[in-house]
Curated annotation (Swiss-Prot):
A motif (Homodimerization) lies at residues 45-49, 115-127. GO terms for cellular component: cytoplasm; nucleus. Its cofactor is heme b. Phytoglobin that reduces nitrite to nitric oxide (NO) under anoxic conditions (e.g. during flooding or in waterlogged soil). May not function as an oxygen storage or transport protein. Has an unusually high affinity for O(2) through an hexacoordinate heme iron because of a very low dissociation constant. This is Anaerobic nitrite reductase GLB1. SUPFAM superfamilies: Globin-like. It comes from Zea mays subsp. parviglumis (Balsas teosinte). Its main location: cytoplasm. Residues 12-162 form the Globin domain. The lineage of its organism: Eukaryota, Viridiplantae, Streptophyta, Embryophyta, Tracheophyta. It comes from the Eukaryota.
Length: 165
């Protein structure tokens, strides 16, 4: 399944990709809090230094899996990412509110988030989704659909990662 391109060169999220994302999100949505935490624990397993980017984790003695602030943040990020993916084709673009994108861009810039951080997060997201779905639901096409949706969300955040003029 190839990604279609619009006349302006933008990548179009196709019907098949949308169907895969919607089907898998329907399975995962009811367990979003747990999956969000697993997603972040994977990020920290791959890149332990990423914990230092979160003020609420820096001086905390609470184990990550029990940290209420991490649980809340992780669920929020996971749900926003998945909902943005689910709306991508219908809206034709990332549907996170512009004010939210600006805030995300500014926050990611302030904490020095770089391409490598987005790559680790993308890998952790795909692994979390793969583990959350029944084995017969996960496929290369499913992986590509989620990877494309994540890529478009990251591109939207990066567009807002600019220093104040």
């Amino acid at each position: 399944m190839a990604l279609a391109e619009a006349d302006d060169g933008a990548v179009v999220f196709g019907e098949e990709q949308e169907a895969l994302v919607l089907k898998s999100w329907a399975v995962m949505k009811k367990d979003a809090a747990n999956l969000g935490l697993r997603f972040f624990l994977k990020v920290f397993e791959i890149a332990p230094s990423a914990k230092q980017m979160f003020s609420f984790l820096r001086d905390s003695d609470v184990p990550l899996e029990k940290n209420p602030k991490l649980k809340t943040h992780a669920m929020s990020v996971f749900v926003m990412t998945c909902e943005a993916a689910a709306q991508l084709r219908k809206a034709g673009k990332v549907t996170v509110r512009e004010t939210t994108l600006k805030r995300l861009g500014a926050t990611h810039l302030r904490y020095g988030v770089a391409d490598g951080h987005f790559e680790v997060t993308g890998f952790a997201l795909l692994e979390t989704i793969k583990e959350a779905l029944p084995a017969d639901m996960w496929s290369l096409e499913m992986k590509k659909a989620w990877a494309e949706a994540y890529s478009q969300l990251v591109a939207a955040i990066k567009r807002e990662m600019k220093p104040d003029a």
